[in-house]
Amino acid sequence: MTGPSAAGRAGTADNVVGVEVTIDGMLVIADRLHLVDFPVTLGIRPNIPQEDLRDIVWEQVQRDLTAQGVLDLHGEPQPTVAEMVETLGRPDRTLEGRWWRRDIGGVMVRFVVCRRGDRHVIAARDGDMLVLQLVAPQVGLAGMVTAVLGPAEPANVEPLTGVATELAECTTASQLTQYGIAPASARVYAEIVGNPTGWVEIVASQRHPGGTTTQTDAAAGVLDSKLGRLVSLPRRVGGDLYGSFLPGTQQNLERALDGLLELLPAGAWLDHTSDHAQASSRG
């Protein structure tokens, strides 16, 4: 994920605007915007219970953010920063990802893709730092997730589908061939599942009028290895949860995310009623 050149400094590049802040910095910005809730995955929550100590810390953080151009001289967030943080705090849809990076010692990177209206924001947390990017909608959901994960060669495998609980018990190539795939594909699947360099679980949520949310009870996935990338998508058929595994192309990642979003009440990333209204207003 491409970050700005300096921590806490807002920057622009083409159709992406980004800012990097500490958790304390995010809490100060959220306080200015009267926001208290953020996607759970990011773990943005008050971290200084003593009010007097918090005020001292926040005063210094505000000075730093002002010097870096994130806040103006009146202590208010720069407009684009405010838009990004409001999108995180009051999203219409959210993808929440947890990325376990076995290739760098088991570090977990937490990230989200949020939509509010037609505004899209990516946010990733690594330690106490948060990187936010405002992204053009035409980048697409797969492109936004790949902005965090980076590109990878798709694994050379056939599609594999089965009941999720049954597939979870398959650890050998011989078990996987029972699902009708060729032995060569089964061996690749077994190797990737047994020796991944990283894996990602992504869930989706929808915000309803009044502020309540619904989250999917299943996850889409990305699995990286030396043999390439796999993606998995959940589907419900007759009450059973099925999992489908596919080579990790951008098109298949988009399919996986679309399949995940179908589990939400709205069934999609966009609100079709608002899309229709916007189309009507454009004539």
From Swiss-Prot:
Keywords: Chaperone, Cytoplasm. It is found in: Cytoplasm. The keyword Membrane does not apply. It comes from the Bacteria. Disruption phenotype: Inactivation leads to the attenuation of the recombinant strain, in spite of strong EsxA (ESAT-6) secretion and generation of specific T-cell responses. Mutant has lower amounts of PPE68. Its main location: cytoplasm. The keyword Cytoplasm applies. GO terms for cellular component: cytoplasm; plasma membrane. One of its GO terms (biological process) is response to hypoxia. Pfam families: ESX-1_EspG. Interacts specifically with ESX-1-dependent PE/PPE proteins. Interacts with PPE68. Specific chaperone for cognate PE/PPE proteins. Plays an important role in preventing aggregation of PE/PPE dimers. Belongs to the EspG family. This is ESX-1 secretion-associated protein EspG1. The lineage of its organism: Bacteria, Bacillati, Actinomycetota, Actinomycetes, Mycobacteriales.
